[in-house]
Amino acid sequence: WWRELLKKLAFTAAGHLGSVLAAKQSGW
């Protein structure tokens, strides 16, 4: 079950990183 948890964590981290990068590009 920990693999599913790890996958979910990685997916969440990737999404968070994407939003942070988008914010930086928009001038934050």
UniProtKB/Swiss-Prot annotation:
Tissue expression from the record: Expressed by the skin glands.
Keywords per UniProt: Antibiotic, Antimicrobial, Cytolysis, Secreted
GO terms under biological process: defense response to bacterium; killing of cells of another organism
Coiled coil: none
Any one cellular-component term (Gene Ontology): extracellular region
Subcellular location: Secreted
Superkingdom classification of source: Eukaryota
Keyword Lyase included in the entry's annotation: no
Transmembrane segments: none
Protein's job: Thanks to its amphiphilic alpha-helice(s), it may integrate into membrane phospholipids, leading to lysis of the membrane. Has no substantial hemolytic activity. Has antibacterial activity with a broad spectrum against various species of bacteria including both Gram-positive and Gram-negative groups.
Subunit field text: Exists as aggregates of 3-4 molecules.
The family this protein is said to belong to: Belongs to the grammistin family. Group 3 subfamily.
Protein name: Grammistin Gs A
